[in-house]
């Protein structure tokens, strides 16, 4: 098996790391084990923050490409923002939430019920996704 310094890939990997770290940090010495565990928890937090920053960066790049594609097609895209939406958490890839209008606004509801308008939106986003994938090729595991 191969391991790299990163967040644990599964529970077994975490258990193994805790066991091995315990052996290196003083075996059954409870104080040493507790200190090592605190260091491990801090490291996991730092690695999690780094992975989150990478995900935010990739999501920002995708958002910029999609925003540009939508604006280029004449769609009214207001702004690019950031917020901790639940539906965006835990995605292992760039993730974007796109608000296309409000059904409570009669004018926007009419647009959103138009097949040609929806086709235009979908075409713009599909074009943006293709552009993003070409600019950021996926590396297989």
Regions found by a protein language model. Give the residues of each.
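Active-site-proximal helix/loop segments of hydrolytic enzymes
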Residues: 1-141
């Amino acid at each position: 098996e191969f391991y790299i310094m990163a967040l644990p890939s599964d529970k077994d990997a975490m258990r193994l790391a805790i066991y091995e770290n315990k052996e290196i940090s003083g075996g059954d010495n409870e104080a040493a084990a507790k200190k090592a565990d605190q260091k491990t928890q801090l490291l996991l937090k730092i690695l999690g923050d780094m992975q989150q920053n990478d995900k935010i960066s990739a999501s920002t790049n995708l958002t910029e490409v999609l925003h540009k594609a939508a604006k280029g097609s004449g769609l009214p895209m207001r702004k690019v923002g950031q917020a901790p939406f639940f539906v965006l958490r835990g995605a292992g890839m760039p993730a974007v939430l796109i608000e296309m209008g409000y059904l409570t606004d009669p004018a926007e509801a009419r647009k959103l019920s138009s097949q040609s308008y929806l086709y235009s939106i979908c075409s713009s986003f599909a074009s943006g996704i293709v552009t993003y994938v070409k600019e950021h090729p996926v590396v297989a595991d």
